[in-house]
Amino acid sequence: MNRLPSRAWAKAAPCPALALAALGLLGAQPCQAVTFGSEHGISGSVDSTLSYGFASRLQSPDCHLLGNDNGGCNTATHNELGRYYNLERGNGYANADINYSNADDGNLNYHKHDVFSQVLKGTHELSLRFGEGWSALGRVAWARDFKMDDTRRTDLEGPARRDATQRFDLLDLWLAKSFDLGDMPAKVKVGNQVISWGAELFVSGGINQINALSLPKYHTPGTQLKEVFIPAPMASFSLGLTDALNLEGYYQFKWNGYDVDPVGTYFSSADIAGEGRRAIYYPTGFVEGLQPGTCAGSPTGRCGDPLTSGLSHEQLVASGLAVPYGGERKPGNGGQYGLALRWMAESINTEFGLFYQRYHDKLPFIGYTARSNPDALVVDDYFINYGEDKDLFGVSMSTLVGPVAVAGELSFRPHDSVAIDPTVAFGQGLTGSYNRYSVFDTGVSKGFVEQRKWQADVNATYTFSGNDPLGFIPNALGASDGFLLAEVAVTRYPGLDTSGRVPYVLPDYSLPDRTSWGYVTEFGLNYPNLFGSGVTVTPQLDFSHDVKGTTPNAMPFVEGRRSLTASLLFNHRDRWKGGLQWVRYWGGGDNNLMADRDFVSGNISYSF
């Protein structure tokens, strides 16, 4: 009876739906570098930023997002997928309690008003210039969190504790050469680097996906934008074919994936993805629905994890009440590359871009093996899996419409990975009919199917003051200027089977939609030299709304999901910076695993 759910929504590893651009405001960007060298020799600069930050929970866990053994009140078998796969029809079993029971450690570990992060961190950068057009950059970051492992229910496992409390990361490390190729300016860069293509600002899933992200860093108070993107070992080039036409390309030497939140930490939304991952434990309601009376033999009369059942991990696995972790199957290091062609149409002051990328998935899926006894619904183990050899085609544009910077992009993925739960469907041993989506028939499931995906994005950036159309706002509120950013995106999976036959994965086992869309806005005002202090104060609001439709993998949209962040940012001559943030999540029903994770945070940093 070793069945387990897919955890592919852990792909989302949700983080606040705020502008990554805003991180540049929240964190300190060092401007007071120590410079050295001469014009004709080696010259360079050393930049460092030290920061301290904290974050505290503002609400108690919501029972709809917890396993029912842990005080939850989730939907269990009352779900859309269960209308197709259910015990009464004898063709499958979709009980969402197994999803929430294996996704709530981070939620249960911190109570309302708990300080879940108290972090001291630093970023250090060395930039060099030498010779004829040579340059180099090295950047490292470290962090020490004093509160993340102060948990209420489940101790952080060794790898999770190390990742959550002590980090040292090598970020950029590259060497570049600028030169002329005939009459064409060129540049080649080799080493750990970040490449940003496309036009998106806030919404993920478009063209800008060359580099993986570090979600733990995103969730760390005081994070700088350049720390969030994980540099990848690549060789890249740019070549100015004409004054208006530019060619760019890259080849990635080694694959790296998303860094997801360690299991049991505050923003972790999957107990089997990330450092500290553990076995999948079957909750009482799930087991009793299949085999009544099974859990009565445990010390507590319940199934679930060791704390709930009173049985050890080994006992649970041996009795078929848990499924062990079977390892990570990483993609190959080769086969990732891309080309970009940019054309500046000067007559209309608009840049157009064409893009192609060959890539491997950077976000994890959950695969399964079921070879020992599939007719008894035995799953041998689960493994972390990634799709390989994917293609992305994209176009973009950027221009000015009056004082407003407008940009947009359209991307197409002919074989996007869409998560399924192949343990929901019973195999032919029980149904008499072969089901290609059932791991009990295939023996091994990679945990996803492939679908065509389109995503379109349009965004605008507007800064205003005094006599501008929106200048009355800063004038009325005593500010010098303001800024407004807005983005709308839509995702389309034209071939998605919404009948329920394909067991797509969402936390509550509802079915995803072919079309989904949403928007994000950011608004702020600047008050320079407030009260003659030399401090620029910036109040800022960020709001996101997933308006209609839920995307497969719950990324980027979950219908009805919203978030709001109110920030108050301080900048004293680009040396001292700080901020206070209040973050609220709501909407999206039981698919919004962040709906009860409201928090407040603050940080202060010093750059030198």
Where are the regions a protein language model picked out?
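Outer membrane beta-barrel
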Residues: 133-276, 548-549, 557-562, 583-587
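Residues that define the transmembrane beta-barrel architecture of outer-membrane proteins
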Residues: 42, 116-120, 166-171, 229-233, ...
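Transmembrane beta-strands of outer-membrane beta-barrel proteins
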Residues: 44-52, 136-138, 186-190, 247-249, ...
